[in-house]
Amino acid sequence: MQLNSTEISELIKKRIAQFDVVSEAQSTGTIVSVSDGIIRIHGLADVMQGEMIELPGNRYAIALNLERDSVGAVVMGPYADLAEGMSVKCTGRILEVPVGRGLLGRVVNTLGQPIDGKGEIDNDGFSPVEVIAPGVIDRQSVDQPVQTGYKAVDSMVPIGRGQRELIIGDRQTGKTALAIDAIIAQKDSGIKCIYVAIGQKASTIANVVRKLEEHGALANTIVVVASASESAALQYLAPYSGCAMGEYFRDRGEDALIVYDDLSKQAVAYRQISLLLRRPPGREAFPGDVFYLHSRLLERAARVSADYVESFTNGAVKGQTGSLTALPIIETQAGDVSAFVPTNVISITDGQIFLESSLFNSGIRPAVNPGISVSRVGSAAQTKAIKKLSGGIRTALAQYRELAAFAQFASDLDDATRKQLSHGQKVTELLKQKQFAPMPVSEQALVLFAAEFGYLDDVELERIGSFESALLAYANSNHTDFMKNLAKSGDYNDSIKDQLKAIVEDFKKNGAW
């Protein structure tokens, strides 16, 4: 069959009419060097600071240095097979992570991908890892407590919802143990928890996850992992990813608690990236913006007002405030809190819990130093019962420390001094607590009541621990309803005071410990 010229012309016109051309403008570039997870790219004239750059093999890098004729970017993931001359392109978007209730009970990496072998995550959407913190008008003052379950913390350095409380101390002083116990204590409080592990051994993280599961707290917790074997870029970004996951709950009128374990390792990872990008080093070789690294992260922990929540949810949630409480951890070297990163984080946070290796080694655990541990906003959030009963604890410990130092040089002491020393020793003994045994408000109130009103004066120092255990067992078995109500309300009045007095006096009359 032969086509004449008219038919050919019509066919060509028909094909031209059917042809749909979509022009796509792409900003592409070429890798000019690869070293230690840092790539330099020629081209990409339109790239933004912090933009994701698509690499071969379904990987991404983040643009951190925008220079005159090249772009410095950090690779998120393996980089050994990247080579000079490979083509890369802009994506036009910044790093986002999955957020939502589907992440609770899961272990994820910095990018929000599951690494616990439990299948895909049913997330509610995505959120950028870098978000501007709520402004002053959107915030509300801290006036609700976060119970850690530790007598020493809840009585002397109370933490409120929306507060940033630093946990600082040398290695092996119980920093992680304190944070994990605080998470375990939230399993029935309705507070969602996020634990961000930065630069730790995989075996240590696995142990933490197992402990959370054993104590029924994992179902309420998201674990974000950037282990020591991960690249510096992922260790640097992990806290921001965890924070974005916590903000999901904060912005919907719920309460969340996030632990950064620890920010010293994040600062080291950021220093490594900055030096490889040839940014000028400053004090201790950290870059000039290491303060901003932590301040922009910790300022995102806040208690936000009901108006903010209503506006964010487009009216779906009304009359509820939201909060994100942060417990950053910093590791010091030989107790030096005046080093660069520790002083930065101390100045950003609303107080610090200082753990001392000398106390830890002498068997005082948690090893909280009450002299330099402080909570700047938490006292407004403390439960009434603990606030009323813990007033004398800090004073007793401060006097005891002072007198103990003085008593070393004095041969004979008067009765009043001996009494103060004895009381201080007993209070110190009473504040000791085993790991994975957080105490509800009612039990703390009962124990503090016994200390405050002199019921320990005739108990031998060695018997304080057994006295406490027996007293709590007696109260929980014989006054169950009262203890449950006190744990729920945390209130304190004359009626509760009389009831506590009756419990302790009855126990001392009948109890064997």
From Swiss-Prot:
E.C. numbers: 7.1.2.2
Signal peptide interval: none
A GO molecular-function annotation: ADP binding
Reaction it catalyzes: ATP + H2O + 4 H(+)(in) = ADP + phosphate + 5 H(+)(out)
Keyword field contains Transmembrane: no
Cell compartment(s), UniProt: Cell inner membrane
Family note: Belongs to the ATPase alpha/beta chains family.
NCBIfam families membership: atpA (TIGR00962), PRK13343.1 (NF009884)
Role of this protein: Produces ATP from ADP in the presence of a proton gradient across the membrane. The alpha chain is a regulatory subunit.
Name of the protein in its database record: ATP synthase subunit alpha
Species of the source: Actinobacillus pleuropneumoniae serotype 7 (strain AP76)
Lineage, broadest ranks: Bacteria, Pseudomonadati, Pseudomonadota, Gammaproteobacteria, Pasteurellales
Encoding gene (name): atpA
